[in-house]
Amino acid sequence: MAATEDVGYIDHPLLTEAFIERRLYQLQLADAAKQGHTLVCLPTGLGKTTVSLLVTAERLEAVGGTALLLAPTKPLVQQHAEFYREALQIPDDKIVVFTGEVRPEDRAELFESAKIVIATPQVIENDLVGNRISLADVTHLTFDECHRGTGDYAYVYIAERYHADAEEQLVTAMSASPGGTKEDIQTICDNLGLDGVEVMTEDDADVDEFTHDTDVEWKRTDLPQELLDIRDG
């Protein structure tokens, strides 16, 4: 995956020209994630989704198949879909969104023809249980907000099915805060079948230039009478 040094954008056959800014830390994380099932830890606002997109582009170009990106909420799914459609030279109708609003029979047909499926995990879990879809041809699976991958959350079942069914497997799991302890992180890795952990923080030199100090301004305001009554009651 080359970078165009003169304008600072990443050059790749599946990427929209002059769209993805070249950031060394994202390239490093993506290169690591291409080597195996990886947990990518990166602070909020620094482009975890871009890292996964770079891996997806490389997998689709080199291996083919379908990419599946899971996010826990409908707004996140829509946000990712908009970004992927802008950033990738793939027809919009080949980047499909699955939520509970899409009929199950329609999802089955769309899954077969899509290059990238972006979905809430509950929908994919239901379709797997109902044998409407197969993960056999999914060559890149991304778990966004992967710290949710515990207990009976749908991520855990989907990961189990993926590792059992997919022929060309690669998992990328993303989170700004995967857990407070090593044990928490290990649980996520075990549940999602991850082999490695890549961490970058705002203190890393390659990341620091893209972070900004936050200015906090405090303002006092008078509470309305009804809230005062509740407080003093």
Q: Each PLM stretch: what is its role?
A:
Residues 1-233:
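N-terminal helicase ATP-binding lobe
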